[in-house]
Structures are given as C-alpha cells and as structure tokens.
Amino acid sequence: MIARTKIICTIGPATNTPEMLEKLLDAGMNVARLNFSHGTHESHGRTIAILKELREKRQVPLAIMLDTKGPEIRLGQVESPIKVQPGDRLTLVSKEILGSKESGVTLYPSCVFPYVRERAPVLIDDGYIQAVVVNAQEHMVEIEFQNSGEIKSNKSLSIKDIDVALPFMTEKDIADLKFGVEQELDLIAASFVRCNEDIDSMRKVLESFGRPNMPIIAKIENHLGVQNFQEIARAADGIMIARGDLGIELSIVEVPGLQKFMARASRETGRFCITATQMLESMIRNPLPTRAEVSDVANAIYDGTSAVMLSGETASGAHPVHAVKTMRSIIQETEKTFDYHAFFQLNDKNSALKVSPYLEAIGFSGIQIAEKASAKAIIVYTQTGGSPMFLSKYRPYLPIIAVTPNRNVYYRLAVEWGVYPMLTLESNRTVWRHQACVYGVEKGILSNYDKILVFSRGAGMQDTNNLTLTTVHDALSPSLDEIVP
C-alpha cells in the first residue's frame, strides 16, 4: 500500500550505520535529516557517503537534508549527563569548558549574558527541564532547577523575557552551508527564520557557493516567524512547523491552531509543509506509541501536511526502525479516510509557485478528469519540478509519477505529498511514458489495463499544455507481458 505523506528521519548515533540506514529506507524513510547542531563535518560526511551509496544501490529518490544550527541559545559539551533535582543549582559560563556539575556548563552564544536578568524562567531541552535565574553576572549565570532531569551536551535553552538580536546565520552556519553545497545535498532547513530577508540572505550565501537554487525550508520557531509567516512562505521553498521551540517561545496551547493555519497557508502559497517534533516521542524508549501520539500524527495528515518528521525517535531512540514502520502504518491507515475532495477548495490566488499559464488552466481540471475516468495515476514530465508540485497542492487521490531528467529535482521531489519521482534520460514522450508505466507497475501503483492521465508538452512547446487519457496496456504495448504476468 502506498503512502502519500512523506517521512523524514533524523539520523544520529542510533542509525548512522549502513545496516540501520537501509532498514530505515525499507521501513519508509523518504528524507534523511542531518542535524548540524550536533556532529562534525567529518562525522556527517561519513553518513552522507553511506546515504548516497545506499540510494544509488537501491535506485530510490532518498533526499538528504541539512538542518542548520541557527542563531539559537544552546548549552555546550558536558563530560557526562548531569542529573539534577529540584533546588539544585548549575552555573552557566561564557568560557568554553567541558561541562560538569562542579565546574558549570558553557552557554552559547556569549553575547546573551548581559541581557539575562534574575528571576527569568529558563527552559532546557524543549522545556522538559525548567529552572529560574538566581544570579546574573557579566560572564556567568546561575540557575536553580524546578524539576528533575538530565543535562546533556548541546541541548537547547530558552530564557524568557530576553531581548537580544542574534544574527540569523553564524559563522558555523555559513561553513555548514558551504559543506552542504560541496557534498551536493538536496535540502536546507533554516533554523529560527524570522522574516523573508533571512531567506534572502541565505540564498545569497548559497549563490556565492554556486548553488543559488538549493531548496530552503524555513523553520518556524518563534513569534516573529509566525508574525511574518506569509512573506516567509513566499520566499522559502518549504515550511517546517518546528513545534518544540514554537511551544517554548509562544504559549504551548497556541501551537495546534498555528499548526493548522501554517499547513493550509503553505499549500495555498504552493509550498510543502513538514510537521515536526515529538510526533512519536515515547518511542524513544517504548516499543509502542501512546494513543495521543497516533492521533497527533493522524491529525497532522488530515491537516494536509506534506511530511511528518521523526527526531529523537530515529536519532537516538531504542526503536528507530519500528518508529518508522509505525509512522508509515499510521499514514496508510489515515489516508484511507482522508477527505481528498476537501482539499480541492484551495484559495491559491496568492500562490508563489511559478508555473506556466497552460498548467494553471488545465492542472486542476486534469485531476478532475482523471478521477471521473477512474484513472489510477497521473504521470507528468518535469524539468524543474513545478508541474508535480502544482498538482500535489490539491492533494489528489491519484499518485503523481513525476518523470524528470534533472537529478536535483528527482531528489527534491522526495518531500512532496503524493509525488513519486522517477529519473530518466529520455525526452521523447512515448519513451518516458513507457518508462513511467513500467515504474508504476514495479511499485505496485499500476497494473495492466489501468487508466492513466499524462501531462506533457506539445510539439514545439516549452511548457506543460497537453492532457492524454490512456491505459497502461496501450502505453506499454507490446512489451507488457514481459513485465506483468
């Protein structure tokens, strides 16, 4: 059974071996996320090499995402996890040290120290650990814990009521982007985006490294990101609803409503949307998710999210492969009751997705024709990815087989809802249509006499302007018997 909603897996110590990565792929992983808040270029380089070798061996559109560290406040390295209890105190310092309970822990960046005030609430590790500032000095802050937990290396930290303007991109981020371009990665997730100028500045950096069109996903994690959402969505290529930091920066009870708003607004703008953070969090430790987590994933799918993301579940959890299998099962079951026609009602007058006027005229009508004809799939040839992205935003019941000669587009489409990318060297319509049908049969999407709707370009045309309703048999004949018994 196919799954239209895509799965993003964060890769970490629990999964960064060839054997585990192949198991994640078999379980349903579509995108491998590398979190550059952790690790080194050397360690990420090893993982990237394994992923590239794997996707070449298996001939699958597995995308690789670089997630930037961004301008966040974060703890430094600790010698070993520091166990804390209510009433315990810990010193945060500006100098770089290997942290411990006795010596304290480094707090990055050091420019925040002058802005910290006593009695300010402190949230660590997505709010799991709470504390309060009891002593604030120029290069040192002392906090007192209000609940128990473990302080680990590189965990996020949020200080309420702090007013400091952090730069959008750090020197580390720029070095990481350069590394990502050199490694020919497929997607960039930009942390703590506040406005469209942040996206523009990152594009200029990518352009200076020779990759101006590298897709950028804007992570919405603070009140400015929410406030400027519409302009950010137009500037970016995709949106990530980063619920962890969002639930710290804003009231946690606001997150569900914002999630629904951003999922719909992303589609209307023509951008894919990723729902992230704590989706199957309990599976970090337990073999089964909670009922609430299953409902959370299902509701994100009902909202029309393009992809759902696993973080600690696959990076460091005890059951990473089972977490992906569970996520895929939830997707498949939920999509049985997905209201596909409800997503036809789309106010896309302000869409930022640039497609030809021909496709705008025939795209939605084509989906309706295919459904009325009981077709089993839509096949579309694309050089830029625009046509399948345009069709995907309407969330059609029919799988979209996207045939492309562009390797960057092939991997980039891995995150698009309902799109199944296929790489080709052919531009002849008869040939690539034949190849797409073979692909559909091999993937279990199509069979012998299924009807298909093909979007293509007419002779001498540069843009998609032609619809053809045909059958798999006619497209494959006379070689169908060699493929389907």
Curated annotation (Swiss-Prot):
Gene3D superfamilies: Phosphoenolpyruvate-binding domains, PK beta-barrel domain-like, Pyruvate kinase, C-terminal domain. This is Pyruvate kinase. Belongs to the pyruvate kinase family. Mg(2+) binds at residues 221, 245. The record marks 219 as: Transition state stabilizer. It catalyses: pyruvate + ATP = phosphoenolpyruvate + ADP + H(+). Substrate binds at residues 33, 244-245, 277. ATP binds at residues 35-38, 74, 155. InterPro entries: Pyr_Knase, Pyrv/PenolPyrv_kinase-like_dom, Pyrv_kinase-like_dom_sf, Pyrv_Knase-like_insert_dom_sf, Pyrv_Knase_brl, Pyrv_Knase_C, Pyrv_Knase_C_sf, Pyrv_Knase_insert_dom_sf. K(+) binds at residues 35, 37, 67-68.
